[in-house]
Amino acid sequence: EEWLPFSLLMHCRNTSEYNFIKMTVLDKLQEYDRRYQSSLLDTLSAALRENSLEDAAERQHIHINTLRYRLGKIKEITQKNYFKMTDRYFLLLCIMIQRMEHEQL
């Protein structure tokens, strides 16, 4: 069942919507991480995967305030607010796209 959302996304590959999602968030965060040797994408992935910010901070081995700072930086870069449900869904799609492309699904 875990593969189903990826299957749906795979059918959207190379569409304008797919590329928009990539350019709006994924490409910007990858460029920021490359340029500043940071780990915003990893932090975002952990925050989306865990049940709480505390768990996400623990998984990343960072303080909760550092996690909040990074989520703020993600918002600054992408204009997507982790704490807003529709934006969080958009961010989740980006992480799924990243995983798909990284694993060549």
PLM regions with names:
Residues 1-105:
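Cytosolic nucleotide-utilizing catalytic cores of signal-transduction proteins
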